[in-house]
Amino acid sequence: MPQQLSPINIETKKAISNARLKPLDIHYNESKPTTIQNTGKLVRINFKGGYISGGFLPNEYVLSSLHIYWGKEDDYGSNHLIDVYKYSGEINLVHWNKKKYSSYEEAKKHDDGLIIISIFLQVSDHKNVYFQKIVNQLDSIRSANTSAPFDSVFYLDNLLPSKLDYFTYLGTTINHSADAVWIIFPTPINIHSDQLSKFRTLLSSSNHEGKPHYITENYRNPYKLNDDTQVYYSGEIIRAATTPPARENYFMRWLSDLRETCFSYYQKYIEENKTFAIIAIVFVFILTAILFFMSRRYSREKQN
């Protein structure tokens, strides 16, 4: 049978719910970004440290790099689709089987060598303070085929979605150079339109009539599913899990952003200025409590 090319549209009604697909163990706490690149086609961040295990994985897969995809408009920029729903963008986290193979180049020659985690980006009304750390680096790689040190404290865990149930299937890398097992989180993370538009100002490696060309879009259209391709889901299929996030109460959203900002300050200054860091984490706890009671009140109001 022909190889299943990626990306694909995942039809939830055809996905096979498999309770044996246990939660993943994600160990990104020790991952550190080393460099950020404009490859002329996408943004790539190289990492040192970090790995995933558990779930259906036979052993640890080491994090290698992060790739970002987007479109001309905010309503379509993801490679993969869920029930034909198009997300604003997509992050791909590439891992390789270090226990079994000696290098990434060796691992990608085998169908159990690569694991790619997909995280969807959904444009909303507020900025993502963690994603902003990537956006802040883009000016240093505006030209095609350039790279720069990633000179900001960055915790990849903060870009994980709130729910980690996942779809999985055997496909290929986006450029079809190797087989890859895909792990796709249907729950997106929210970013602001201004953050995504910054990626469209990067220069492409291709020129048009001698003039600079921008990477206005770089997503790939989905391929038809082969007859023998199976898509599995790590839990009970719930259609609502794949629908776009509803708009939240504005004030609660603002409080949530403020809490994330305070937590970001805590992480940044814990070594440099402990007093400031302690004040920041106190605000995090206070805002968390406020959000908790407001969400309970909001839930009761909806029920009534």
UniProtKB/Swiss-Prot annotation:
Record's comment on post-translational modification: Apparently non-glycosylated.
What Pfam families does the record point to?
Carb_anhydrase
One record GO biological process: virion attachment to host cell
Q: Which domain of life is it from?
A: Viruses
Residue ranges constituting the Alpha-carbonic anhydrase domain according to the UniProt record: 1-235
Recorded GO CC terms: membrane; viral envelope; virion membrane
UniProt topological domain (Intravirion) ranges: 295-304
| Molecular functions (GO terms) | carbonate dehydratase activity; zinc ion binding
Please give the InterPro entries that the UniProt record associates with this protein: CA_dom, CA_dom_sf, Carbonic_anhydrase_a-class
- Induction or repression: Expressed in the late phase of the viral replicative cycle.
Q: Which UniProt keywords apply?
A: Disulfide bond, Host-virus interaction, Late protein, Membrane, Transmembrane, Transmembrane helix, Viral attachment to host cell, Viral envelope protein, Virion, Virus entry into host cell
Q: Which residues lie on this side of the membrane: Virion surface?
A: 1-275
Q: Where are the bilayer-spanning segments?
A: 276-294
Subcellular localization: Virion membrane
Subunit relationships: Homodimer; disulfide-linked.
Give the family, as the similarity comment puts it. Belongs to the alpha-carbonic anhydrase family.
Q: Give the function comment from the record.
A: Binds to chondroitin sulfate on the cell surface to provide virion attachment to target cell.
Per its record, how is this protein called by name?
Answer: Cell surface-binding protein OPG105
What is the native source organism of this protein? Answer: Vaccinia virus (strain Tian Tan)
What are the top taxonomic ranks of the organism?
Viruses, Varidnaviria, Bamfordvirae, Nucleocytoviricota, Pokkesviricetes
